[in-house]
Structure formats: structure tokens, C-alpha cells
Amino acid sequence: MAGKAEPVGTSGRREREKAKRREDILRAAREVFFSTGAGRATIDDVAARAEVSKGTIYLYFESKEAILAHLVLEGLDILSGQLKAAYAPKKDLPAEERVRRLAHAYLKFSKSHPQYFRLLMAFDRGQFRERVPEPLYQEVSERSAASLRWVEQALEQGRASGQFAVADPGRMAGVLWASLNGVMLLLDHPLRQEILGVPLNTLFDSTLELLLHGLDAEPTVRRSSQTKKGAQS
């Protein structure tokens, strides 16, 4: 005997309710992770903030790390949009200018979205790899790599034009990212800035110029031309 037919529209309403509940949980998780940090945040905290049971959380997310992965993807979406705008693919820009624009877009992102920046710096610690479903983990990995590819493209452009002496643009993009990240993380505390006696922007720009000098195919020529420009101004 056939079961009673589900009323028209019931299935769609349930799906909308599930989607809303999931968004409510993510919103609560965002508040918890932003205020306490990824390391100290717990599923219990998220459940309390969302005003649902702990079991309800697990109906929508496999683990705390899975929630973190979704928040990381939110941050990567914002960062990717800002990097694309900085790269300006439709504009005819020198490779060096593109690298500078990308670097400063990254610095701006860290200041305008500090909570997302901190999640991006900390998300792969602990048991993130083991506790995030494989498809979700791969999405985070691929989207992270996609952001870095803007830098790689700028370096490839510089190599093609003869401006940069770069054997492996992909590897050098990683070097640039790691170096600038180091500066940003080091000075993400007022005491460290006080110890070094240098504000973040100054040290960031000095590091970027040092890296660009190392990439330059003709560093002596560029340095002398910059010196002449400075003398003429």
C-alpha cells in the first residue's frame, strides 16, 4: 500500500529550513571563531551561540575543522576578489607593478579582514587534514593555490619580458608569499613593532623591495636608474 503523498511545497520548505539552519550555525561559528580564535573555539561554544544542541551541529558539519574549512573558504573568496582586482588582468601593467599591487592587496586584506587573515594563517594546524572531508579539503587546497597563482602569473610575465630572472615562477611565488607572511605575522603585535622600532608598512615595503631586487634580471641598471630619478626630483 502506497504511503501518503507529501503535500506540495513541503519538501521545498524543509530544504529552505535546513539551509537557513546551516547558515545560522555558520554565522554563530563565525562569531565564536573570530572572538576566541580557531584553536580555542569548540563545538559546544558554537552550539550555545546558535542556540541549538551539539547533536544538531553534527547533522550539518562533520567536525569543528569542517566548520573552520567553510570559514576559510569565505576568507579565500574575499582575498581572491581583491587579488584579481589588484592584478587587473585587462590592464597592460609591468610585471613589477603587478607584484607590488598584489602584495599590497594582501596586506590590505590582512588589515581590513584580520579575523579571516588569522584563520587563513592557522587553519591547517592540528588535525585539520584528518578531520575535514576529502572533497572539502581539496576545495580549500585548490582555492588557496588559485590565490597564489595571481603572483605566479605576474612572475611569469616578468620572466617572459626579460624583467625577472626567475627559473621557477611557481616556487618563487611561494617564496614571496612566505616572506611577506613572515613580516605580517611578526608585526601582528604592538610589542614586536616596538622592539623592532619599525611600523608594519615600512618593514613590509622594505622586504618587498628586497625581494623585487632579487628577482630583477638587471638589478644594477634598475638601481642606478632609480638613483638618477631620485637625484633629478
Language-model features, listed with the residues they occupy:
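Basic, helix-initiating cap at the start of DNA-binding domains
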Residues: 1-36, 40-49, 66-69, 90
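Base-recognition residues in the alpha-helical recognition helix of bacterial helix-turn-helix
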Residues: 34, 59-62, 70, 74
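Amphipathic alpha-helical segments used for helix-helix packing
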Residues: 112-135, 185-189
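C-terminal peripheral helix-coil segments that are non-catalytic and often amphipathic
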Residues: 1-9, 105-108, 145-161, 179-189, ...
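Hydrophobic alpha-helical connector segments
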Residues: 70, 84-116, 173-176, 220, ...
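Short hydrophobic clusters on alpha-helical segments that form packing/core surfaces
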Residues: 25-33, 75, 106, 110
